[in-house]
UniProtKB/Swiss-Prot annotation:
NCBIfam families: PRK11187.1. Homodimer. Polymerizes to form helical filaments. Belongs to the SeqA family. The gene is seqA. It comes from Vibrio atlanticus (strain LGP32) (Vibrio splendidus (strain Mel32)). This is Negative modulator of initiation of replication. It is found in: Cytoplasm. GO terms for biological process: negative regulation of DNA-templated DNA replication initiation; regulation of DNA-templated transcription. The keyword Transcription regulation does not apply. One of its GO terms (cellular component) is cytoplasm.
Amino acid sequence: MKTIEVDEDLYRFIAGQTERIGESASDILRRLLLVDNQGTVPIEEIVEPKGIVVSKEVGFTPEKFDGVKEMRSLLISDEFASLKKAIDRFMLVLSTLHKIDPLSFSEATQVKGRKRVYFADNEATLLANGNTTKPKAIPQSPFWVITNNNTSRKRQMVEQLMSRMNFQAELIEKVTGSI
C-alpha cells in the first residue's frame, strides 16, 4: 500500500464519490478510473520515494457545489414547494446537504442529543438507542436519521448540522424556517 498526499478539494471529491460505508480510496479511484484489478500488469517497484505528492496543477478539476446556491435553489424549487409534510422537507434538506459536501456532512452527523443519537450509518444503531426512533434512510446518502421527533427538533437538528458545515446563520434560518 502506497501513501499519497492530495489537496483538500481533491480529497473531498474522492470522499464524495463513496458509494458504500467502508469503501477504500483505492476502490473509489479504481471505479472512477474504470480500472479492473484483474487486468493490471505488475510494474517494477522503485523503492526510493516514500510517497507521491499530487498537486492541483495536474489539471483535474473536481465537481464543486456552491452550497449556498444549492440550498437557495432547493428552497425555491417546485419539488420542495410541493412537499406538504415537514418530514419530507426535512429528508430533502438532509439529502441536499449530503450532496453538497459529503465529507462535512459526515463529520457534522456526529450531532447527538442528551439521550439520543440522531444520525448513524445504519438503522440498527438508531434502533439500539430506542425502539420508537422510526429511523429513515437519507436519500442518496449512506446515512440514517431518527424521525419520530417534532418539527421543532427536526429544525434544531438541521440548524446544528448546517452550523457544523459552516453555512451562514441567515441561510440556516431560512432553511430551518422552511421545514
